[in-house]
């Protein structure tokens, strides 16, 4: 297994952290290839649950390299908060590596993120306000500052001067916010540069050398397919390519090295922030409230309630196509226990036209009406099941239905939040 990609198949929060935590110990290296501190994932370290945002989940496994690739953006404040937390739990983070080509999140990026979101009013996107969009905007505008730039004091100051000449007038005149000086930012960031220096590598070179040596790499996706800047529900998306294709550009590893693509999907559906969601249910009553409360559907990064709805096979079909999924991991199957019947969306009706996958035209998706089938639920607590055969017949049929509708085999089934509460069918 030279290289595999793990990717979210819905709108994020599918349980990628748990599945990465589960399988990453079988790899020599885990590499994050996109996103920044907006992507919360929960891992278990020495018996303690930790919420990580910046550092790859593989960090909890001794002997596994954890690489932050060139497609990521790095907030040193968040990163070293996580390093300190992990070290307090007895993990030395010696396996952490950071691409010198990854871009820096700077204080003005966060200010601009929050101000721009506020200016959108009722059309807000639902950003985490962690500076992600403005940082990627600078990257694409070729005015961004990379981690390697911070290692040279004079170069860092020179680039900051140029950046602030552009950003300060926007902060002051457009949004009425305080401006920054070069010295202000250097006072905070240059000490981080020295802490970061031992971890910085030429990540593409490192990753390809590992593959040449016969080592295995897991590319850990952040966010999800439906939040991808190109393939998601634009403009209600993140600012990076978080689908499987981003693993190539965000790491510098060629596509021929990737053997398997594991898509993570909840047994139902959730979404944080604005944007279309055809199978959405009310959180105030009925099944929507049931899923919110039993599934503890609150964002790791923001603490916001997640919007909840029925499983949408059209979204999974779309994710399978866009990512080239070879396998699926279905999480939170246990949450559905207690429902008499379960609805599954198999198609959309858009003004009398039927779609069996996500329409690429945004307006069509906004007006999509889900077409459901109903299947029997189950009352049993399945959190103790450790093999597929132990599941109730209705739960097994539900998994088989997902396979039939998506055309992708379900290799992993999660029946609880703990690493052990997992059924491994075909992932070897």
Language-model-derived ranges and their functions:
Residues 1-428:
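Non-transmembrane, aqueous-exposed alpha-helical and coiled segments at domain scale
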């Amino acid at each position: 297994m030279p290289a595999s990609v793990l990717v979210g198949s819905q709108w994020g929060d599918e349980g990628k952290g748990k599945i990465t935590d589960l399988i990453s110990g079988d790899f020599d290296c885990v590499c994050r290839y996109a996103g920044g501190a907006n992507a919360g994932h929960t891992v278990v370290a020495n018996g303690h649950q930790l919420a990580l945002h910046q550092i790859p989940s593989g960090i909890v496994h001794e002997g596994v390299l954890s690489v932050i690739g060139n497609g990521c953006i790095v907030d040193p404040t968040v990163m070293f908060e996580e390093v300190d937390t992990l070290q307090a739990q007895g993990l030395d983070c010696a396996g952490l590596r950071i691409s010198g080509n990854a871009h820096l999140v700077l204080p003005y990026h966060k200010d601009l993120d929050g101000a721009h979101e506020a200016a959108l009013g009722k059309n807000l996107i639902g950003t985490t306000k962690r500076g992600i969009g403005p940082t990627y905007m600078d990257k694409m505008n070729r005015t961004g500052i990379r981690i390697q730039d911070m290692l040279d004091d004079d170069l860092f100051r020179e680039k900051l001067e140029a950046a602030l000449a552009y950003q300060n007038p926007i902060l002051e005149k457009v949004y009425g916010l305080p401006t920054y000086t070069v010295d202000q930012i250097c006072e905070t960031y240059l000490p981080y540069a020295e802490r970061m220096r031992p971890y910085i590598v030429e990540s593409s070179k490192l990753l390809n050398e590992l593959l040449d040596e016969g080592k295995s790499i897991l590319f850990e996706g952040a966010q999800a397919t439906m939040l991808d800047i190109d393939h998601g529900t634009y403009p209600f998306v993140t600012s990076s390519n978080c689908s499987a294709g981003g693993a190539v550009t965000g790491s510098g590893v060629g596509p021929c090295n990737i053997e398997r693509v594991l898509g993570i999907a909840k047994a139902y559906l959730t979404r944080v922030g604005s944007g279309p969601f055809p199978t959405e249910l009310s959180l105030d009553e009925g099944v929507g409230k049931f899923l919110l409360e039993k599934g503890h559907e609150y964002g790791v990064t923001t603490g916001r309630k997640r919007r909840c709805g029925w499983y949408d096979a059209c979204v999974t079909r779309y994710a399978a196509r866009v990512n080239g999924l070879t396998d699926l991991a279905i999480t939170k199957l246990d949450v559905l226990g207690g429902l008499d019947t379960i609805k599954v969306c198999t198609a959309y009706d858009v003004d009398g036209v039927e779609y069996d996958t996500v329409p690429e035209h945004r307006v069509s998706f906004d007006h999509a009406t889900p077409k459901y089938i109903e299947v029997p639920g189950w009352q049993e607590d399945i959190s103790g099941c450790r093999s597929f055969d132990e599941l109730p017949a209705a739960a097994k049929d539900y998994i088989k239905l997902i396979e039939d509708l998506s055309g992708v085999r379900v290799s992993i089934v999660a029946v609880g939040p703990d690493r052990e509460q997992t059924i491994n069918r075909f992932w070897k």
